[in-house]
Design a protein with these regions (language model features):
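Extracellular/surface-associated beta-sandwich interaction domains
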Residues: 1-275
Length: 275
């Protein structure tokens, strides 16, 4: 016996069909990318978010199986959601053809959407719709791993979620893209909200009197060893982890090498994400 719920009878019956198909498929279905690990830094009228690249290496075995390995890694991009309540009701604004809230809308600041995707030829509206709506894959912006929100009010509580998403399937398999889950849990007795790795709760505020923010001398990083023709510029994203009067050394390692074995037809092969 099971209980099916929905916004109305039609929505509940649709959810029943999805549950039945999932059962008949032995719970084998496409997997959303893992959520990134997000850190928030609050400031005076400002919130900075930054996150790691762990989501970009997520393997989707189901997609890999049905595409003969072509879409084993179908990561596509990141989106930032912002709300003033932990249920993210502020962001649940995209409804399907029946008026049911279905997708969250990426946060928009000064007319610019907080969404970034790979430059891989996959952009715009995904061809497969979900009850009359389509998923926007992005506009070939390239990836970023930090974001600054300057449209905040000191003393106001905000919740941010950084989700990774994939590009799904196509019209041959009718698999739509999916976001990584926003993991949070509310204790019904105490009201305490437990946040997952990609959700943060912040209250921006001015710094305490006498606070001196982390800084560094010079405009560029001095090249001390190795072969390189590039220039490296610094930006301190999280001043709280920079220790006073310390000297830091930054090292880089190639993430790719020439593919002389003809692997998968590519001219480079990724070895590591970063060090």
């Amino acid at each position: 016996m099971s209980v099916m719920m929905g916004n109305d009878q039609e929505d509940a019956l649709r959810n029943k069909l999805v549950a039945q198909l999932t059962y008949e498929s032995d719970y084998q279905f496409a997997k959303a990318p893992d959520p990134p690990n997000v850190t928030a830094v609050v400031g005076d009228g400002q919130v900075t978010l930054y996150w790691d690249r762990s989501a970009e290496n997520t393997a989707d075995k189901y997609m890999g199986n049905i595409t003969n390995g072509a879409d084993l890694n179908d990561f596509e991009g990141y989106k930032v959601y912002r709300a003033t309540d932990f249920e993210f009701n502020d962001a649940y604004t995209i409804t399907d053809g029946d008026g049911n809230a279905t997708f969250l809308e990426a946060y928009v600041q000064n007319g610019v959407k907080a969404q970034w995707d790979l430059i891989d030829g996959k952009s715009g509206w995904h061809p497969v719709d979900l009850n009359g709506i389509k998923f926007n894959l992005g506009d070939e912006s390239g990836l970023v791993h930090s974001y600054v929100d300057n449209n905040v009010v000191n003393g106001q509580r905000y919740y941010y979620a950084v989700v990774s998403y994939d590009y799904g399937g196509d019209l041959t398999n009718n698999i739509i893209p999916s976001d990584s889950p926003m993991k949070l849990r509310v204790n019904s007795l105490t009201g305490v909200v437990t946040l997952g790795p990609n959700v943060v709760e912040v209250v921006p505020s001015p710094p305490s009197a006498g606070y001196v923010e982390a800084s560094y001398s010079g405009d560029m990083v001095d090249h001390v060893s190795g072969s390189s023709s590039g220039e490296v510029f610094l930006e301190i994203i999280d001043p709280m982890i920079v220790k006073d009067a310390h000297t830091y050394q930054i090292t880089f390692e190639d993430t790719s090498f020439l593919n002389q074995q003809g692997l998968a037809g590519y001219d480079t092969v990724t070895t590591k994400s970063y060090t």
